[in-house]
Amino acid sequence: VRGLTGDALGIDGYTATGVTVTVRAKHVIAAGGAINTPALLLRSRVPDPHGRIGLRTFIHPVNLTIAEMPEKVDPYYGAPQSIASDYFQWRDGATGPMGYKLEVPPMFPGISSGVFNALGDDLRRQMAALPHTNAMLALLRDGFVPESPGGRVRIADDGSPVLDYDVSDYVWDGVRRAYLSMAEAQFAAGAKRVRPAHLDGQDYTSWTQAREAIGQLPLKKFRALLFTAHLMGGCGMSDDPKRGVVNSAGRHHQLENLSVFDGSVFPTSIGANPQLSVFALTAQNVSALSRSIKP
């Protein structure tokens, strides 16, 4: 890498100023995350003899269920997502059916009004019941079997990054089992009614009713509501250049003075909120890099 050239943007982060900036350095670190780092390398035409840049981008597909509890739970107060369960995460091994981590997210009014998937009087009723509302979500760990290859980052005609992510039958099976696990847990906790976040989902008033109905829900795009908050992969690490963009130290296989230090180097998803893992891996690799570069 001989240098970096970029267009300076205005204070809003979007408007071009017409100013071009070139930076030269002994070593360059890309740390744009699982979408922007692959996009940067693709736009820069970084050597990619094995076509790995942008592949195996993982998102932890998320689905959720919403319950009305008899007592107030005030889901918008307190430390968010402080309760979680890994019971279903590795129960069948890494290569068995898709595992998932269960979490209890906060339910702020703005977010809630969107996930309730309701209008008019129905939405008013559900918002009025928000103090009694509990939500559970499942982080489905993608990337551990061939049936779950993740997505691919590519560059649109205007130069912006696009993520293509196909939801396979393997993932849909995990979505259905997660719906069932969450609904069962909510009824066990005393829920008056439970509804999956699905356009065909209804309020179910018993576990028996929910189990039968969820088993019949059509699982396909634009019917089941899927979310993500975690982006990983796209510049996966492997000490085999045919399988990774960088090695396990984050060093690029083809360009000796380029490193990638962010979540894009994950070779799979990790089945957990990745913030601390990104911090730890980056701290390890940047420390090793600093020792290897002579002043």
Where are these regions (language model features)?
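Surface-exposed helix-capping loop/turn segments at secondary-structure junctions
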Residues: 46, 184-197, 292-295
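Non-transmembrane alpha-helical segments in soluble domains
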Residues: 41, 176-179, 183-187, 286, ...
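Secondary-structure capping and boundary motifs in well-ordered enzyme cores
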Residues: 32-33, 174, 229, 249-252, ...
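A conserved FAD-binding loop/helix module that cradles the flavin
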Residues: 267-287
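Cytochrome P450 core scaffold surrounding the K-helix E-X-X-R motif
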Residues: 39, 147-150, 246, 269-270
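FAD cofactor-binding and catalytic pocket of flavoenzymes
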Residues: 50-180, 184, 222, 228-231, ...
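Glycine-rich loop(s) and the adjacent beta-strand/alpha-helix scaffold that form part
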Residues: 1-3, 11-81, 262, 281, ...
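A glycine-rich dinucleotide-binding beta-alpha-beta segment and adjacent secondary-structure elements
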Residues: 1-10, 191-268
